[in-house]
Amino acid sequence: MIKDIIKLSIPRKPDYISLVRLTASGIAHSMALNIDDIEDIKVSIGEACINVLSLNNTEEISLIFEIDEDKLCIKVKDVKENIPKELDQSKERELGILIIKSLMDEVEFNEEGIIMIKYVEDDSQ
């Protein structure tokens, strides 16, 4: 069961990616995630936002943070995994997707965008 949902929309400008990273960091910290996981989340969400910036013409980037007892689920709309070659001439987007997949516990792409999940580790074990 989802505990809290935070929705964030930012202008489609690179200047606001740091705000998204800071927001994600604050949310992750409030969930008692360790510093390594917080840094992984910050890098991943930054890469997801860069993907949106380079891809579409929407006026804003929409994010949803779903806070659960054992995980943080982050949804970023309009992130794409596979781009037609005529629209993408660089390897940077591919690298960004690989970074996200390596840092987050679960990553799923769908027609709306990307879903990234980081689980809270139980330190009592």
Residue positions per predicted region:
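Conserved beta-strand-loop-beta-strand hairpin that lines the nucleotide-binding pocket
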Residues: 1-6, 51-125
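Residue-level detector of secondary-structure transition/capping positions
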Residues: 28, 46-49, 80
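Conserved ATP-binding N-box helix of the HATPase_c
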Residues: 35-60
